[in-house]
Amino acid sequence: MKGTIIKGIGGFYYIKIDNSEEIIECKARGKFRHTELTPMIGDYVEISIDKNNKGAIEKIYERRSELFRPAVANVTQALVVFSFKNPDINIDLLNKFLLLCEYNNLKAIVCFNKMDLVNKEDYKDIISMIEQAGYDIIFLNAKEERNMDIIKKLIKDNVTVFCGPSGVGKSTMLNKIIGKETMITGNISEKLKRGKHTTRHSELIYVDEGLLVDTPGFSSLDINFMEKEDLLHCIPEFRDFIGECKFTGCLHHREPNCAVKKAVEEGHIHKDRYNFYIKTLEEFMNRRKKKW
């Protein structure tokens, strides 16, 4: 049988079988320890069931993508959720989430929630910065379900992770999207023993022909595992100017005749995105100096 790992806890993995609402509890075969391949939420797997009705993961199919913070496989897109007010927007944090999406080859869609609290015109420079970077933006008021129909359409045929700081309304969005009528409730709830006040672990939820990553650990992030060379490739606006700088390996920092810096001066790259890049690059370089 084949299916998708929707939850993993204490060495047990819960697999939703293809074309069924059946959830089977499995352990991973010992052979995976020798390959250093650990099953992850989102993995598409092949399982067997022995005569004692015990399940075992026999094969993990090739992953399209891997996230390690949180640990989820085969995610296709991220909804990066922020609000302008309550809490006030942190531009550097938003840019860090976008960096992480680029690093993991995820399509990022920026969702500004709680739009009933603000005048969009007051934040047009931030909006311009995100649009100029090439990201789609959706303006929401999740409590009143404003534009939630757009979100539901995006989820179809995708594995979607919600990310963003605490308090911006991610839980409200999830609740509006999932709804009691669309959750596979009884079977999953019984198998996973998920109570109202239990400790939460990452899991996948099937809804509207798509999968949602419901995770408690994607509200803040650390990008210190990245190298400065990674950073260069995680700012999509730079890509049109790669190879046009005077020096090979240009970091677009203090080097002369830099095509990226010229693009900033000419308004092709937003100055705030470039300033964020320089700030982050210098943090990475200072970190490396401290190691030595």
UniProtKB/Swiss-Prot annotation:
Name what cofactor the protein needs.
Zn(2+)
User: Quick one: which residues bind Zn(2+)?
Assistant: 245, 250, 252, 258
Write down the EC number.
3.6.1.-
Subcellular location(s) of the protein: Cytoplasm
Keyword terms: Cytoplasm, GTP-binding, Hydrolase, Metal-binding, Nucleotide-binding, Ribosome biogenesis, RNA-binding, rRNA-binding, Zinc
Q: Which amino acid positions bind GTP, per UniProt?
A: 113-116, 164-172
Give the matching SUPFAM superfamilies.
Nucleic acid-binding proteins, P-loop containing nucleoside triphosphate hydrolases
Q: Name one GO molecular function term.
A: GTP binding
Is the keyword Cytoplasm assigned to this protein? yes
Q: Does the keyword Transmembrane apply?
A: no
Q: Where is the CP-type G domain?
A: 64-221
Q: Name the Pfam families for this protein.
A: RsgA_GTPase (PF03193), RsgA_N (PF16745)
Q: How is the cofactor bound?
A: Binds 1 zinc ion per subunit.
Q: Would you kindly state one Gene Ontology biological process term found in this protein's UniProt entry?
A: translation
User: GO cellular-component terms in the record?
Assistant: cytoplasm
Task: Identify its protein family.
Answer: Belongs to the TRAFAC class YlqF/YawG GTPase family. RsgA subfamily.
Summarize subunit and interaction data from the UniProt record for this chain: Monomer. Associates with 30S ribosomal subunit, binds 16S rRNA.
Provide the function of this protein: One of several proteins that assist in the late maturation steps of the functional core of the 30S ribosomal subunit. Helps release RbfA from mature subunits. May play a role in the assembly of ribosomal proteins into the subunit. Circularly permuted GTPase that catalyzes slow GTP hydrolysis, GTPase activity is stimulated by the 30S ribosomal subunit.
Q: Under which name does UniProt file this protein?
A: Small ribosomal subunit biogenesis GTPase RsgA
What species does this protein belong to? Clostridium botulinum (strain Hall / ATCC 3502 / NCTC 13319 / Type A)
Task: Give the gene that encodes this protein.
Answer: rsgA
